[in-house]
């Protein structure tokens, strides 16, 4: 997928298993706060997957590790509806904001998140292979 064009290495069964357990250092003792969420259409076909960490980076926030849409349903507003519904739900629970990051240079991700009211925090996380632009959406 386009995600892996900007964020190597390419996906393998092992990398998926590793990612499903990966947590930031401060959350290593709280694996119960890590979720993989699947979103299905009316025909019960998986159309999106989200990596979600509850109560991170603060107790009143959450973190989207990634959000991937099936290519065939991109551009139809489904992803934005999912994000909007998630934001409404989290706000109703008292959360203050959602944080996420996208790989610098991934224009599709940048555009999607900006369209969905996420703003650049000015923070950058640098890895050996890429730079992550950190964004927040206040709820």
PLM feature segments, named:
Residues 80:
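Residues forming the Rossmann-fold NAD(P)(H) cofactor-binding site
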Residues 114-122:
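Conserved acetyl-CoA-binding loop of GNAT-fold acetyltransferases
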Residues 70-72, 76, 104-105:
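Active-site acidic-Proline motif in GNAT/NAT acetyltransferases
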Residues 100-110, 126-131:
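Conserved beta-strand-loop-alpha-helix junction that forms the acyl-donor binding cleft
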Residues 76, 93-96:
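Short coil/turn segments at alpha/beta junctions that flank glycine-rich nucleotide-binding fingerprints
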Residues 1-72, 83-85, 89, 93, ...:
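Acetyl-CoA-dependent GNAT
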Residues 86-90, 98, 109:
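Short hydrophobic clusters on alpha-helical segments that form packing/core surfaces
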């Amino acid at each position: 997928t386009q995600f892996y064009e900007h964020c190597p290495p390419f996906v393998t069964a092992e990398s998926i298993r590793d990612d499903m357990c990966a947590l930031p250092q401060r959350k290593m003792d709280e694996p119960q706060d890590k979720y993989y969420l699947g979103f299905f259409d009316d025909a019960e076909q998986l159309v999106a997957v989200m990596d979600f960490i509850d109560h991170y980076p603060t107790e009143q926030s959450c973190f989207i590790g990634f959000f991937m849409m099936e290519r065939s349903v991109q551009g139809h507003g489904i992803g934005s509806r999912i994000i909007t519904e998630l934001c409404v739900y989290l706000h109703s629970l008292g959360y203050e904001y959602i944080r996420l990051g996208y790989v610098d240079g991934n224009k599709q991700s940048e555009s999607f998140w900006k369209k969905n009211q996420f703003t650049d925090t000015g923070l950058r996380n640098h890895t050996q292979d890429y730079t992550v632009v950190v964004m927040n959406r206040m709820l």
